[in-house]
């Protein structure tokens, strides 16, 4: 279930927050209008820090969440596909 869209806090934003039971995904959506490779570099270090900060703020106000991850969704409008990368910032 989508619990928030464009959630903002502490000068940071998460595109989507999706929750299923006690698990949460913080989703960064990247849209591409033409064909070509989708790069992991589309989310740079500064943006990663902002997304992480927003996720931490949200989690601070929602105790009881046992699992959380950041997911990147690459939407390619040229061929109507979506590619998901879970645990995007783990490394």
Task: Briefly describe each language-model feature range.
Residues 1-9:
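A short acidic/basic microdomain associated with nuclease active sites
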Residues 7, 29-31, 87:
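Active-site donor-binding loop signature of nucleotide-sugar glycosyltransferases
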Residues 10-12, 78-79:
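Short acidic/glycine-enriched loop/turn segments that link adjacent beta-strands
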Residues 12, 23-25, 71, 83:
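Protein kinase-like catalytic core scaffold
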Residues 14-37, 51:
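Conserved catalytic cores of phosphodiester-cleaving nucleases, focusing on short active-site segments
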Residues 32-57, 61:
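Mg2+/Mn2+-dependent nuclease catalytic core
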Residues 61-91:
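Domain-level recognition of nuclease-like catalytic cores that cleave nucleotide substrates
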């Amino acid at each position: 279930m989508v619990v928030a869209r464009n959630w903002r806090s502490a000068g940071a934003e998460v595109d989507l927050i999706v929750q299923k039971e006690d698990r949460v995904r913080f989703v960064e959506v990247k849209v591409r209008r033409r064909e070509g490779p989708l790069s992991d570099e589309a989310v740079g270090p500064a943006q990663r820090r902002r997304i992480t900060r927003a996720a931490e703020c949200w989690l601070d106000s929602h105790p009881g969440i046992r699992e959380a991850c950041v997911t990147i969704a690459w939407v390619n409008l040229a061929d109507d596909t979506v590619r998901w990368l879970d645990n995007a910032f783990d490394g």
